Amino acid sequence: MLTLDTLNVMLAVSEEGLIEEMIIALLASPQLAVFFEKFPRLKAAITDDVPRWREALRSRLKDARVPPELTEEVMCYQQSQLLSTPQFIVQLPQILDLLHRLNSPWAEQARQLVDANSTITSALHTLFLQRWRLSLIVQATTLNQQLLEEEREQLLSEVQERMTLSGQLEPILADNNTAAGRLWDMSAGQLKRGDYQLIVKYGEFLNEQPELKRLAEQLGRSREAKSIPRNDAQMEAFRTMVREPATVPEQVDGLQQSDDILRLLPPELATLGITELEYEFYRRLVEKQLLTYRLHGESWREKVIERPVVHKDYDEQPRGPFIVCVDTSGSMGGFNEQCAKAFCLALMRIALAENRRCYIMLFSTEIVRYELSGPQGIEQAIRFLSQQFRGGTDLASCFRAIMERLQSREWFDADAVVISDFIAQRLPDDVTSKVKELQRVHQHRFHAVAMSAHGKPGIMRIFDHIWRFDTGMRSRLLRRWRR
């Protein structure tokens, strides 16, 4: 069967112009105009999706099948082009009957054209084919427009669903244009309103706990840039102002022995006039033994010295992915569970904004994994937020899973975050030694988010950073009172 793409090529129908007109009409629709005004960050993300729409429409037109009636008419037209005028005159009755049987828009006009001319000349033969071709072009264009209109309605419905989802989640997950773009890409999944309302619920809870949100932001920024010393130290001139004693006659501060003739005491000067003591005077002058006034004074001068200068390079520390382990034991239920899930949502927001990955592992008696920054991130986040914390605590398995993940190439610069109340048994020695090796050799960092003030110090000592968020009633009341 003839495809629409082949028909467009045969009749020289420009499908690109039709596609561009449809996309322009879609972008100018009132629904998108209102949405762009309300969520300007998502405008760029939707605009970046236009090439994908264009390619999808091309593919749809390319694979579309031409109706059998139009296919038969096109084949008849092609055969008629090969006929000479005498042959065309012979075949004309069959051609008119075929057009009538196919209900072609050209059938009535073709019969009128033939009836209006008693003789079929070569010019009439050419005119008949030209008008027939125009009729086929109109039919092909109409078919293209019908298919594009169907695709437009379907695409508009899809975009509206994604706009609804993105509009609901944009205040929660999109902190900048990068995050808005990634959020729009994630919204392509098949989600219902009731599903993503769970994210909205925990987003509202996070806004009610600004200290928890601030804690997540501090953890996300914890890998700051640092200065790295360079070994190629060189000598450079160093200028400084120094203060030193001077002989400026500011005030007399006492007596001293020196050779300063201008500051001689009168008795010393008197010995110079005595012949017997003259040589004694010169001896004491040479030896700087004459009694003189000691004057007190200061002066500032510039002193230039050379010393080795060590330059430091500003090394921006890469901000790698998050590997977050969440304790789902029974002691982490209730308010602790809400805080842990909201904290992970805050880390997801940071990961989207900074183009990082966010990998969640739930540990109790078994390990359950979710990647919140992938193409299915929203669905994964909903599944994670739907989990119930009712298991046991197996912190050792959590660390083993983290260390296994850190050994892969794509996670070598990840930050490991463990969210727990740390009321658990001590870690095995092999786990502790392996964690310390990763910290020492590979500079991996382990963060602890402590949800209780009663966590075991022996367990928490292994972490590089401990971020405390006490969920006890007293701490909750104090935080509320401060707000």
Curated annotation (Swiss-Prot):
Cellular component per GO, a single term? cytosol
Q: Name the InterPro entries on file.
A: Uncharacterised_CoxE (IPR008912), Uncharacterised_ViaA (IPR023481), VWF_A (IPR002035), vWFA_dom_sf (IPR036465)
Assigned keywords, A-Z: Chaperone, Cytoplasm
- List localization entries: Cytoplasm
Which superkingdom, per the lineage?
A: Bacteria
Supply the Pfam families for this chain.
VWA_CoxE (PF05762)
Q: Which PANTHER family does its entry note?
A: PROTEIN VIAA
Question: What does the sequence similarity comment in the record state about its family?
Answer: Belongs to the ViaA family.
Q: How does it assemble?
A: Homodimer. Interacts with RavA.
Described function: Component of the RavA-ViaA chaperone complex, which may act on the membrane to optimize the function of some of the respiratory chains. ViaA stimulates the ATPase activity of RavA.
Could you tell me what this protein is called? Answer: Regulatory protein ViaA
Provenance organism: Escherichia coli O139:H28 (strain E24377A / ETEC)
| UniProt lineage | Bacteria, Pseudomonadati, Pseudomonadota, Gammaproteobacteria, Enterobacterales
